[in-house]
Each structure stands twice: as structure tokens, then as C-alpha cells.
UniProtKB/Swiss-Prot annotation:
It comes from Methanococcoides burtonii (strain DSM 6242 / NBRC 107633 / OCM 468 / ACE-M). NCBIfam families: nadE, PRK13980.1. This is NH(3)-dependent NAD(+) synthetase. InterPro entries: NAD/GMP_synthase, NAD_synthase, NH(3)-dep_NAD(+)_synth, Rossmann-like_a/b/a_fold. CDD domains: NAD_synthase (cd00553).
Length: 263
């Protein structure tokens, strides 16, 4: 799909989702990365700068450059912007749960994501706004997000854009160059990057997922793209094993009902 057409669809989606709800504004967690920057830009175009609140939530290991880039986005868009350091909140958790000192980087990182989600909803509830998701299609398919953390949102405006498409649209909308050029990172621990964590680049991930979702087999994708079968299998294993992250919690129905009770 043409990237301009995709942008128009997303902007219409944002407006339609809020229409008739009595809610006019949005809260966006602006990390300093490309996904949240794009969501902020799209939200402003859909709702107006006066109706978008950006919140940056660093902690002790957050690079200064992330705070600077998040601030650039807010300044460029003219939106209200808050910086809330979550280091003290993390320390309260660590004091209350002594076992947390032995937690892996992933476990600790997931806690940070869930604290941030709670803060976004606090402000959304306070001002009667929605929490905008910043997940892209590549991450959502791979399950590369924290359940009830950065995955805990009201709507996902860029959830049907692959990471490579996010970059293309961000460049078109004028997202700052420092954000476009940096290595993608969830910022869950010091020095973390998405592609080191995943073991494969987003370019490869997207090249594999697009034909697979269009119905092509793994062998054909391997021969056509030259991507090793091990990488293709690894990507698809992530997609399958993280299905639970893309669905709502399952209910143990006591009869044959399999949808909503009122549907």
C-alpha cells in the first residue's frame, strides 16, 4: 500500500475510534524512539496538538540522548510534555520484593514497561483521554513487547505497519534525523537493542513475514530471498509461540458460547 494512503487511513482510524466517546484527547508515551515519535506525529495530525499529551519516563540507565530526542518530538509538535523519572518507583518495588535483585534483565525490563503503562493510564484517566499504543506490526507478530506493559493500550495506530514502513512514514512526516538513524531499542536495560535481542534485523524480519503472511511457503521464501532457513524458522517460532500476546485472555465457557455473551 502507498505510504500516504496508509497515513490517511491511520489518521481516520484515530478520529473514528474517539468519535462519539466523549473523549477528545490522547496520551502518548514518547520514549525517544521512532515508533512513539510516529504515533505522536499521527495523533497530532488526527486530533490537534492541544489534545495530545506526551510523557517520557526515563530511569537511571536511560541514555540522555533518549530524553533529548523525546523532547525534540514534543517541541516540534507543540504538545504538552511531561518527564517523569521512574527510578524511585523501581526502588520501591525492589525494596518491597527482595527477590527482585536476582531477576533477569528481561524480568526487570518487563516491570519497567508495566510501571510506565500504569503512569500513562493514570494521566489518561485524570484527563479523560485514551492511551495510544506504539507497537508496530513486526513487534506485535513476534510478541516483542511486554504483556500488560507497552502492550497495555487502548488502540494501536501503527499496529499494521511493518517496522520498515514505520521508518518510511516517519521520514515522510519529518521525524528528527537523530531518531531515524538510531538503533531500535525498547530501553528496558542499559545497552539493549531490539536487533541484538532478536538475533536478526527488522529488514530481514519484514522480508520474511510479508510473503509468509501472503501465503508463500518457507522453502520458497528461503530460495527467493536467500534468508537462511534457521532464521526463517526462528522468526516463525516467535510468531506462533507468542499468539497469546495477540489475543485477549481465554474464558473457560460453561456452554458452547465462544464469542462475547451479547454477540
Amino acid at each position: 500500500m502507498d505510504i500516504i494512503q496508509a497515513k490517511d487511513i491511520i489518521i481516520d482510524f484515530i478520529g473514528t475510534k474517539l468519535e462519539g466517546t466523549g473523549i477528545e484527547g490522547a496520551v502518548v508515551g514518547i520514549s525517544g524512539g521512532i515508533d512513539s515519535a510516529l504515533v505522536a506525529y499521527l495523533s497530532v495530525e488526527a486530533l490537534g496538538a492541544e489534545n495530545v499529551l506526551g510523557i517520557h519516563m526515563p530511569e537511571a540507565s536511560t541514555p540522555k540522548s533518549e530524553i533529548e530526542d523525546a523532547s525534540k518530538v514534543a517541541e516540534a509538535l507543540g504538545i504538552d510534555f511531561k518527564v517523569i523519572n521512574i527510578t524511585n518507583v523501581l526502588e520501591v518495588y525492589r525494596t518491597a520484593m527482595p527477590d527482585i535483585d536476582g531477576a533477569s534483565a528481561h524480568v526487570d525490563g518487563n516491570l519497567k514497561a508495566r510501571i510506565r503503562m500504569s503512569m500513562l493510564y493514570y494521566y489518561a484517566n485524570m484527563f479523560g483521554r485514551v492511551v495510544m499504543g506504539t507497537g508496530n506490526k513486526s513487534e506485535i507478530l513476534l510478541g516483542y513487547f511486554t504483556k500488560y506493559g507497552d502492550g497495555g493500550v487502548d488502540i494501536e495506530p501503527i499496529g499494521d505497519l511493518y517496522k520498515t514502513e514505520v521508518r518510511e512514514m516517519s521520514k515522510m512526516l519529518g521525524v528528527p534525523e537523530s531518531i531515524l538513524e538510531k538503533a531500535p531499542s525498547a530501553g528496558l536495560w542499559e545497552g539493549q537493542t531490539d536487533e541484538d535481542d532478536l538475533g536478526v534485523t527488522y529488514e530481514t524480519i519484514d522480508k520474511v513475514l510479508q510473503p509468509i503472511l501472503a501465503g508463500e511457503g518457507q522453502e520458497r521464501v528461503h530460495l527467493k530471498l536467500g534468508v537462511p532457513m534457521e532464521e526463517i524458522s526462528s522468526i516463525l517460532l516467535r510468531v506462533r509461540s507468542n499468539l497469546h500476546k495477540r489475543t485477549t485472555p481465554q474464558i473457560a465457557y460453561l456452554d458452547d458460547l465462544r464469542g462475547d455473551w451479547l454477540s
